[in-house]
Amino acid sequence: MRDTKERIQSEALRLFAENGYQAVTVEQIAAAVGIKAPSLYKHYSGKRAIFDGIVHQMEARDLQQARRYQMPEENGTAENPAGETATMERVCAFSRAQFRDWTEDKFLSRFRRMLTLEQYRDPEMARMYDQYLSAGPVGYLTDIFRPGVDSREEARLLALAFYGPMFLLYSLYDSGERNAAALLDRHMARFAKEHPALAVRTQKEG
């Protein structure tokens, strides 16, 4: 039964990424899995339940990745700034892994494409797009860079300078740019070189 549930999630996400969440029906998902719609309802109550399962898996993987690279698990607060547990080396390693996963991992790349496709059609999808791919990463990096600079505004500008090219490289990768990961490596190396004090001060705060 677990295998069938996983296949349903996998095929549903593939269809969502190709056609958009709104355009896909339960019948189409069932057909892609090779079962009848009534059989699908034995595993999920409907399309929304399948989507919720996908999001739950996404959240679990995101948390696992943060722990693997010893990164803060969420944006910092005044009492517990995210930058206190991060170093520039970890930020770069974590960002490389995130980029690789968002482009090469089947599950994550499809999730990203689904959000990209649906962000203008569905307010919830737009919120999730911001959370995972736009405002969320910028806010996360702003908190991480804050201990190394004089103001939050400066930290936000650094976050934009660091993440902006990475964000653009997602689109270039989707357009066929297979050197995207190498370009990201060069960008991060240059960023660290141009901001050596930031790297040292952030590390000292860890």
Predicted regions and their residues:
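Short, Lys/Arg-enriched anionic-surface-contact patches
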Residues: 1-4
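Amphipathic alpha-helical packing segments from all-alpha helical-bundle domains
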Residues: 103-116, 120-149
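Hydrophobic/aromatic-rich alpha-helical bundle segments in the mid-to-C-terminal region
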Residues: 127-131, 135, 145-192, 202-206
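Short amphipathic alpha-helical interaction/hinge segments
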Residues: 62-66, 106, 123, 166-177
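Hydrophobic/aromatic residues within well-ordered alpha-helical segments
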Residues: 47, 54, 58, 62, ...
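Amphipathic alpha-helical segments that line or abut small-molecule/effector binding pockets
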Residues: 81-104, 109, 113-117, 156, ...
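Amphipathic alpha-helical linker/stalk segments
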Residues: 54-94
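Helix-turn-helix
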Residues: 7, 11-57
